[in-house]
Amino acid sequence: MDLAANEISIYDKLSETVDLVRQTGHQCGMSEKAIEKFIRQLLEKNEPQRGPPQYPLLIAMYKVLLTLGLILFTAYFVIQPFSSLAPEPVLSGAHTWRSLIHHIRLVSLPITKKYMPENKGVPLQGREEDKPFPDFDPWSSNNCEQNESEPIPANCTVCAQILPLKVTLPEDTPKNFERLRPLVIKTGQPLLSAEIQSFSCQYPEVTEGFTEGVLTKWWRCFPERWFPFPYPWRRPLNRSQILRELFPVFTQLPFPKDASLNKCFLIQPEPVVGSKMHEVHDLFTIGSGEAMLQLIPPFQCRRHCQSVAMPIESGDIGYAGAAHWKVYIVARGVQPLVICDGTTLSEL
C-alpha cells in the first residue's frame, strides 16, 4: 500500500511539473511542437525507477536449504571412507577336496593328504614329505575310448600325449619355460584388499567388475590419483611391468619377459556353483577367493584328449598353451573371486 501511494504522489508531481512547463513555454513564445518535444525529453530523463521486489522469507529459505545441502555433502565425504568393506578372503580349501575326488585323481598328491579331513594328523609315508609336488595326471584310460587306427590331427598331438598337469612350488618350478605342458604354481601369496584397491586406483584401465560409486572411488583414491577412471588420452600402459608390479613373484618364474597382464576382474559368488564359466588366456593368477580350473581341448581333439579339472585357490598361478587348451575358471566358495588374466604371448 505504501509503495502504491508513493507512486501516485510521484506521478501527481510530474503532472503538475508538465503543466508548469507547458505554461512557461507558451509565455516564452515556444511552438506547441517544441513544447511537446521538451516535455518528452524531460519525462525520459526523470522516469521513476522501480526497485527489485523484496521477498525476505523466500531468500531466508533459500539460504537455509543451501546450507543444509553443503552440510550433507560434506558429511557424505567424511563418513564414506569409514564404511565397512567386504571381508578379506581367507585361504581355505579343506572343506571342498572330499567332494572333488571323483573328478580328479589326487591320491598320490601330498597336498591332498594334507587337506583331506580323514588324513589330518597322519604323517606321510617314507620320504614323500621331502618330495616336491608330483605330476598331476587327471586322465583316466577307462573313460577315453580312443581308436588307435584313427589318425590323430596335427593340432591334437600335444594333448593326446597325455602330458600330466604339473603342480609345483615357486622354488621347484623348472628353469626353462615349457610351452606345451600345463602348469599350476602354488605361491601362497594372495592379493590383500588394500593391494586390490590401490591397484584399481592406479590402473583403472585393467580392472573390471569392481562396482563402486563414482564419488566413493574418487574419495578413496584421492590424493594418490586425482582422476581414478580410464581416459582415452592416457599413454599406453606397460602391461608386462604391471604384471610384475602386482605379482613380484613373476620375477622369479621362468615365464617370458614379454608376459603381460590383460585385465583383473572381480566375480561374485554364483548362486549355483559351476553355473558360469569364465574363459581366460593362457596365463592367469588367482588374486583372492577359490575356483575350479578347467582345461578343455579343442572340439576336434575331444576324441583323442580329455578335459582337466582341478581346484585352485588364492595365490595360484596357472598356465596352459592357448593353441592346445581352452582355459576356464569357475568360481566356488562364498568369497568374491579376483582373477588376473594375462598371456605369455607378445600380443593379446
Curated annotation (Swiss-Prot):
Residue intervals passing through the bilayer: 59-79
Sorted UniProt keywords: Cytoplasm, Glycoprotein, Golgi apparatus, Membrane, Signal-anchor, Transmembrane, Transmembrane helix
Cytoplasmic compartment spans: 1-58
Chief place of localization: Golgi
Keyword Hydrolase: no
Annotated PANTHER family: BOMBESIN RECEPTOR-ACTIVATED PROTEIN C6ORF89 (PTHR35259:SF1)
Record-given protein name: Bombesin receptor-activated protein C6orf89 homolog
Species whose genome carries this gene: Rattus norvegicus
